[in-house]
Every structure is written in structure tokens, then in C-alpha cells.
């Protein structure tokens, strides 16, 4: 009888250990956490501004002290790091229409539209790179099965990114 109880306890302990291991692995591989780790690895420091699209597997982060911007795709497994001098500008695109723009040497096209019913809000970053001249990141996409945030929050994040880019391009 003691052996049966011992076996039952060992099986229960093994099941608890496996469950705990699976939960820790699931937590570690969570898309947002994984993208933040990839940004940290590519920039070398925690980004001071970040934009994440876990459903697309894309992210962008700014490091002001290191004067660099990182753009990642393929769930953070691929990406590029650009110096601030290589940034040409950025745009906010709502449902296929450019609603705000910042470009080197041009006046800013201010965001004068708040679209609470937008289907898609995209941040496009433009670089002086012939191979990868632009990077698009969906800040909001109504077609995705899981929604986080709202179109208004996405527009505010995009406007904040354009403000950062404008300050970098002027400075």
C-alpha cells in the first residue's frame, strides 16, 4: 500500500513539475514579451519608445542615447538597426490614406483626423536604405482575431512616434 501511495505522489509531483514548466515556457514565449526581448537585444538597451504589433510579428524601438532605431520582423528573428541619420521620415496611414507625415527637409503634415471607426492604422518608417527603404507596422487592425487597444490609442501612439521623428530630423 505504501508503494502505491509513493507512486501516486511521484506521478502527481511529475505532473505538477511539467505543468509549471509549460506555464513558464508559455509566459516566456508570449509574443509581446518576445518582441520586447528582441528589441532589447538589437538595441542593447531598453527602447525609450516602442511600437509593437505582436499579431504581425513586427516591432520598432528608439534608443535616444545610442542614436539608433531598430525595426524587427518575423517575430523578432530578423531586423535592422539604423542610425538616426538614416531616418528619412515617417507616416501614419489610416485605411489606406496618409493622414500625417514627417519627412526630412519638408514641413510636417499634422494629424488632423481622429478616426474612431478606423479599420487599420499603420505607422510607416522611411529610411535611406536602398534594400529596405521603408518599414510598415500595423498599430491597429480590426481584421485581427485578437484586439488590443483601440484606433484612437493607435493614432496617439503614431502621433507620438511622428513627434519623436520630427525632433530627430530637426536636431
Label every model-predicted segment.
Residues 90-171:
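Acidic, Ser/Thr- and proline-rich intrinsically disordered linker/docking segments
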Residues 2-6, 168-171:
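Short, charged, intrinsically disordered terminal tails
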Residues 77-88:
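Short coil-to-beta-strand transition motifs
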Residues 59-61, 68-71, 81, 122-124, ...:
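Ordered hydrophobic segments in well-structured contexts
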Residues 52-54, 82, 135-137:
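Generic detection of short hydrophobic beta-strand segments and adjacent strand-loop junctions
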Amino acid at each position: 500500500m505504501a508503494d502505491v501511495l509513493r507512486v501516486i505522489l511521484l506521478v502527481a509531483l511529475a505532473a505538477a513539475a511539467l505543468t509549471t514548466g509549460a506555464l513558464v515556457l508559455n509566459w516566456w514565449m508570449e509574443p509581446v514579451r518576445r518582441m520586447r526581448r528582441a528589441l532589447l537585444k538589437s538595441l542593447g538597451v531598453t527602447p525609450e519608445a516602442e511600437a509593437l504589433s505582436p499579431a504581425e510579428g513586427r516591432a520598432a524601438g528608439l534608443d535616444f542615447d545610442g542614436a539608433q532605431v531598430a525595426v524587427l520582423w518575423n517575430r523578432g528573428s530578423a531586423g535592422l538597426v539604423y542610425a538616426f541619420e538614416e531616418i528619412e521620415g515617417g507616416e501614419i496611414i489610416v485605411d489606406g490614406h496618409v493622414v500625417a507625415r514627417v519627412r526630412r527637409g519638408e514641413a510636417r503634415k499634422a494629424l488632423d483626423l481622429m478616426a474612431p471607426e478606423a479599420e487599420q492604422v499603420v505607422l510607416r518608417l522611411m529610411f535611406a536604405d536602398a534594400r529596405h527603404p521603408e518599414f510598415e507596422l500595423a498599430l491597429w487592425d480590426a481584421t485581427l482575431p485578437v484586439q488590443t487597444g483601440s484606433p484612437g490609442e493607435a493614432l496617439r501612439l503614431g502621433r507620438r512616434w511622428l513627434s519623436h521623428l520630427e525632433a530627430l530630423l530637426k536636431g
